[in-house]
């Protein structure tokens, strides 16, 4: 009788069933939650340069990128840790609507780099952006106080090279100050970023000369 009562009143099977139902419910709720996140994410449109069309001061490429400029920034790894700093001199000019940005970089470890951008108008307000270490050409678009530039950069890696996708987003905060945030990705994964400020140096010679 004692054994029968013990078997009938043993709480473990009930606990197991309750726990099993709870876990099943949790799994379903978790799946529903993740599904909701996916739906919400898919419904969010990416930020476009046109979202800033009403922002001021208005960025006119031929006005800001004209004459000597300087750039000062940091390079971060994928975790957001600063791994390099740099300063740069830029000489900008325009001829027949085509822009040239001649950039000289000096990094904190002594490395020097030069990049020459050629900006060719596409006829729709955007520009084709070409440079020696850029694969193909990038696309530059501007609206309001903003400039977006997307391109594939080929960078040295050991004895070879690696191509990374760069998303430059620049914002004019005053007539002489442009903020630039760059995101670098490989296979869709973020591998690093660059934060920098570009300053107009009207009337001042480029310091690299």
Q: Residue ranges of each PLM-predicted region?
A:
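Bacterial N-terminal signal peptides that target proteins for export
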Residues: 15, 19-33
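C-terminal motif of bacterial Sec signal peptides marking the signal peptidase cleavage site
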Residues: 41-43
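Sequence-level preference for short, compositionally simple segments enriched
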Residues: 50, 88, 94, 168, ...
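N-terminal helix-cap/turn-to-beta initiation motif at the start of protein domains
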Residues: 52-68
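Central antiparallel beta-sheet cores of small beta-barrel/beta-sandwich binding domains
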Residues: 72, 76-157
